[in-house]
Curated annotation (Swiss-Prot):
This is Ornithine aminotransferase, mitochondrial. The keyword Mitochondrion applies. Its EC number is 2.6.1.13. The modification N6-(pyridoxal phosphate)lysine is found at residue 286. It comes from Drosophila melanogaster. The gene is Oat. It is found in: Mitochondrion matrix. The lineage of its organism: Eukaryota, Metazoa, Ecdysozoa, Arthropoda, Hexapoda.
Length: 431
């Protein structure tokens, strides 16, 4: 029996190699290299994304190149994960040096890198402790678990009665917990039953927030300082300050989801810094590794963090030496190259120029730093605009039908910014 299985396996591998060779030989006849990339993904991959039709093979700084060799401005930055620019040499060097030494230990043992990283990141952001994870959604899950545990141990909420409040149109991932907090049908339909104890209120509505916090079973309010996936929705001035005041007043933890807005993207190290307030729990991700490796972090003070005991939460990869070394290098780049300051300056330039575009095509321009969006009037199609931008050498993606997010890497200089603005203007005027 095993001999037959082995023979089948060899035959399958030989068949695969033959097919691969035949495929390579017929590349020219089958179509462009990009089309072959699309076809392979479509055949063998899950259909859970709708990517722009461009097949990328290289990135450097603010630019990416497709498999045909065409260069583009990257105005998505992997949803703000590549703040430091593609393949930043300092981050690449940190990755390769650590990868050749020690990549993973799990948390079953100590490593000589994790403590160094923990000290660095807690001092930088002003918290007692950090719990290292890998992805942004893991950070959100971690924050929710911390908040619930704190609610039971410290606030004395009755068992299994803790509630977490979220803002409508939030987005923090695709896990069951994350979609349980969503009011977007494309995120939650067909995936119930949902996580209990999650409630939604309007974003940027102080009265609604205060009313919800009066419930003694509420342990936390989790909110993005600027709603990214919703279309770069910037709250009113003073909103975050009121969030801080109300959460303190009602003994509720404020969880700031800075996975997309944090790490210099909005022109400050953190978006909450605009109002000089500190959340009880801070979630970081994406650019924490400069797009080089999945790294996320949840930071808070001892009163909250020490509610979690050994064995109650963790991750095999969370806090691994490779991720820690990469994250420290990525954070150093933000500071050494003054990328928050550059994002602030370049963002002002971008919004000022975008505001001159014809109002019959672009009805709204909004954002902070280099997290920006335009709203396309309904008689035009945002997807079609993005296709034309691609043809003209700039990559961006629509969100929610009529909104296009503009978020280039923070290393962009003024010459590059003006060149990319010219592409946007040319494209919009052609509509």
């Amino acid at each position: 029996m095993f001999a037959k299985l082995s023979a089948r396996g060899i035959a399958t591998r030989m068949s695969f190699l033959a097919q691969k060779t035949a495929s390579q030989e017929t590349t020219a006849a089958a179509g462009s290299r990009s089309e072959l990339v699309y076809a392979r993904e479509n055949k063998y991959g899950a259909h859970n994304y709708h990517p722009l039709p461009v097949a990328l093979t290289k990135g450097e700084g603010v630019f990416v190149w497709d498999v045909e060799g065409k260069r583009y401005f990257d105005y998505l930055s992997a949803y703000s994960a590549v703040n430091q620019g593609h393949c930043h040499p300092k981050i690449v060097a940190a990755l390769t040096a650590q990868a050749s030494k020690l990549a993973l230990t799990s948390r079953a043992f100590y490593s000589d890198v994790l403590g160094e990283y923990e000290e660095y990141v807690t001092k930088l952001f002003g918290f007692d402790k950090v719990l290292p994870m890998n992805t942004g959604v893991e950070g959100g899950e971690t924050a929710c678990k911390l908040a619930r545990k704190w609610g039971y141990l410290e606030k004395k909420i009755p068992a299994n009665q803790a509630k977490i409040i979220f803002a409508r149109n939030n987005f923090w991932g695709r896990t069951l917990s994350a979609v349980s907090a969503s009011n977007d049908p494309s995120s939650y339909e067909g995936f119930g039953p949902f996580m209990p104890g999650f409630e939604l209120i309007e974003y940027d509505n102080v009265s609604a927030l205060e009313e919800s916090l009066k419930d003694p079973n509420v342990c936390a309010f989790m909110v993005e300082p600027i709603q990214g996936e919703a279309g770069v929705v910037v709250p009113s001035d003073g909103y975050l300050k009121k969030v801080r005041e109300l959460c303190t007043k009602y003994n509720v933890l404020w969880i700031a989801d800075e996975v997309q807005t944090g790490l210099a993207r909005t022109g400050k190290l953190l978006a909450v810094d605009y109002e000089q307030v500190q959340p009880d729990i801070l979630i970081l991700g994406k650019a924490l590794s400069g797009g080089m490796y999945p790294v996320s972090a949840v930071l808070c003070n001892d009163q909250v963090m020490l509610c979690i005991k050994p064995g109650e939460h963790g991750s095999t990869y969370g806090g691994n030496p490779l991720g820690c070394r990469v994250a420290m290098a990525a954070l150093e780049v933000l500071q050494e190259e003054k990328l928050a300051e550059n994002a602030f300056k370049m963002g002002d330039l971008l919004r000022n120029e975008l505001s001159t575009l014809p109002k019959d095509v672009v009805s709204v321009v909004r954002g902070k730093g280099l997290l920006n969006a335009i709203v396309i009037n309904q008689k035009f199609d945002a997807w079609e605009v993005c296709l034309r931008l691609k043809e003209n050498g700039l990559l961006a993606k629509p969100t929610h039908g009529d909104i296009i997010r503009f978020a280039p890497p923070l290393v962009i200089n003024e010459t590059q910014m003006r060149e990319s603005i010219d592409i946007i203007r040319k494209t919009i005027l052609s509509m």
